[in-house]
Structures are given as structure tokens and as C-alpha cells.
């Protein structure tokens, strides 16, 4: 979808993630890229089966505003938000994050 600029009516990556994870059936790791802005987004992606997430815009915002220290601060914020979310859900490690922690509507188009 490339930031919603080219096809703003396409499904969000997080909406397509469960379908992709089911389709590959564990044969390859699935990475989610697109729409990740907060630590809660990272948590949701991991809970829905992503092995990793790509984060672009928040780092670019930090870089544009404050240079390298801005990028480092964005990373600190995302880590803090993820840790807070994990704590609120009772998960101690990333491996503890499962689908049970998110409710998804019927995202079928």
C-alpha cells in the first residue's frame, strides 16, 4: 500500500496479516511493514503472527526533527510502549505474546 498514497482503499497491512500468516503456515517467517507507529502496533503485529515489524516513518520524523538523537528517542519511546503493553497484558517476553491478546473483527473484504 506504500503509505496509503497509491491505493488508499487497500486493506491495511495489519488487517491482511492473519490471512498471510495462515497461508504460509509457518513455512517462512512473516514480517509486517506499514502502519507501525506505536509500541501497541508492534504488540498487535506480534500477537497476530508477525515475527518482526518494519518501522519507517517514526524514525524519519525523529531524524528530521532532532537528527540521530531523535531516532534514538523514537526507539526508546517504542520500546517503552511495547514494554508497558506487555506488562499490562501480563507477558514477560515477546515469546509470550499470542493471538489471545487481540480481538479482530471480520476483516474479510
Which residue ranges define each predicted feature?
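Glycine-rich, proline-tolerant flexible connector loops at the mouths of alpha/beta enzymes
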Residues: 1-11, 60-63
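Alpha/beta catalytic cores of nucleotide-metabolism and tRNA/nucleoside-modifying enzymes
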Residues: 15-32, 37-109
